[in-house]
Structures are given as C-alpha cells and as structure tokens.
Amino acid sequence: KELLRKDNHHGAYSSFEGSPLSKGKFQFDLWDVTPSDRYDWDELRRSIMEHGVRNSLCVAPMPTASTSQILANNECFEPFTSNIYSRRTLAGEFVVINKHLMKELNHEGLWNLELKNKIIEHKGSIQKIDGIPQNIKNKYKIVWDMSMKRLIDMAKDRGAFICQSQSMNLWVEDPNYKNLTSMHFYAWRAGLKTGIYYLRRKAKHQAQQFTIEPNQEPASVSETEGACEMCSG
C-alpha cells in the first residue's frame, strides 16, 4: 500500500495502459496459479487498475553472493554448495560453516573437531557420515546431493510471483549434451523466463587439504567462485 501511495504521487509508468497489470492481471494470474488468501489481492487489483504502478518490474531474485556473506547467509534462494568451505575476500581467506547445521549438531551433542574434519573429507556433504540422524541429513543436502530437476521445480513455484526473472544457477558434476539439453527443455516446459544463469561443475582436480589432521585422508574444502558484481551489490 505504501508503494501504491508513492505511485499515486508520481504517476504510472508511460506504457502502463494496455499492460497485463492495467487489466488487473498479476504475474500469478498469467501463470494460472491461485495464491493463498493471506492478502487481499482483489483490493490491490482494484487500486492498481485505478491508479497504475510506477514500475513495470519489481522483483528479480539474484545470487547476492557478497551481500549474503555479510550476515553469514547463503546466496539468495540457492542451496548450499558445501556445508563447510573457504571464502576469499579482499580481507583474506577464512572458513565458513553452515551455521544452521552446526547448531543442530551441537544440540544433538555431535559437533566436534573430528566431525568437522569428516565433513571436509566428504567435500562438504554429510550424507555418508555415520552417526548423523537421517532427518538432519535430509535437511542439509548440498547441491551435489540434489536433483537439478527439483531445483527447477522450485524455480517454477517461485516464478509465478516474480515479475521479471530469477538468476537460477544449476550444478552438474559432469555436464554433457544430453543432460544439459534435458535441463534446458525441462526449464522451458516449466515456463521459466530464464533457463539458467551460471552452470557450475565440480573441479577435475582437488587441491591438497591442510586443514585436517595429517593422518587423515586429504580432501578439499569447496571454494566459492567469483560472482557477478552487478548481482553482489
């Protein structure tokens, strides 16, 4: 309502007339999706049709890699790429741990240095670590434990409420013509405006790991990749 008040003051954007919004059609209407009754959509619809809106596009979720890190959050709507990884910034390099996972493991009395090293050995995944309850494993899957089809399905669910588009990254361990074509067509059939932002793959070679005990098997901590500066704010 506050946005509508400001829109009334400044007036609608120049090509508002004839747009779907001018006809009372929200993005979810264009997707044939029925929203929850949490909000009074009909009142908002009538007000927009009467007064217009100042901006034709308002929502475009992006990765926000740098800004998310400031508050120790993960990038926007993305799953974690690892439950423990190293982060490189202008201030230096430091280790980041999934704070939500660590809190639950602490609550269960499981978190310790040995478990931390096991997570590093398993490249940030907890799926094959004995002793961790299955409900925690189910909750804290990383992207390499997930089906990309499920990520596209979630993007479809969000899409009905996104007027512009979303920067959706996908992860494939060994990308090839077959799986990339399958993903792109699945996203297209789902109605996504943008089929993919970045395609991420696993590194062919793993670096020597110096953060675990010498007598343990070395493995890599996932490192975050460079992000689009426009999206990182």
Q: Model-derived features: where do they sit?
A:
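Catalytic alpha/beta core of large soluble enzyme barrels
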Residues: R5, A12, K25, L30, ...
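Extended, well-ordered alpha-helical scaffold/bundle regions in very large, multi-domain proteins
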Residues: K1-K23
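Short acidic, low-complexity intrinsically disordered linear motifs used
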Residues: S220-G233
